[in-house]
UniProtKB/Swiss-Prot annotation:
The chain crosses the membrane at residues 10-30, 52-72. One of its GO terms (cellular component) is proton-transporting two-sector ATPase complex, proton-transporting domain. The record marks D60 as: Reversibly protonated during proton transport. It is found in: Cell inner membrane. F(1)F(0) ATP synthase produces ATP from ADP in the presence of a proton or sodium gradient. F-type ATPases consist of two structural domains, F(1) containing the extramembraneous catalytic core and F(0) containing the membrane proton channel, linked together by a central stalk and a peripheral stalk. During catalysis, ATP synthesis in the catalytic domain of F(1) is coupled via a rotary mechanism of the central stalk subunits to proton translocation. Key component of the F(0) channel; it plays a direct role in translocation across the membrane. A homomeric c-ring of between 10-14 subunits forms the central stalk rotor element with the F(1) delta and epsilon subunits. This is ATP synthase subunit c. The gene is atpE.
Length: 83
């Protein structure tokens, strides 16, 4: 039982940590490309900004789904029935 709980805790930590890391990298790339596009064509900056916010919302949504799955694994422990 302790092994399953320990492995579940490690899986939850990896899921949340990798989700946060992926989101940070994604936001960095997204912001950099937005600034690059706005510097090249300043007249398109408002349109690019709207698209950037839509993609940023989707990027956050993927991370929140991962956090939800991690919390589900942590508190319900679906692997406990294997014992």
């Amino acid at each position: 039982m302790e092994t399953i709980l320990g492995m579940t805790a490690i899986a939850v930590a990896l899921l949340i940590g990798m989700g946060a890391l992926g989101t940070a990298i994604g936001f960095g790339l997204l912001g950099g490309k937005f600034l690059e596009g706005a510097a090249r064509q300043p007249e398109m900056a408002p349109m690019l900004q709207v698209k950037m916010f839509i993609v940023a919302g989707l990027l956050d949504a993927v991370t929140m789904i991962g956090v939800g799955i991690a919390l589900y694994m942590l508190f319900t422990n679906p692997l406990g029935a294997m014992l």
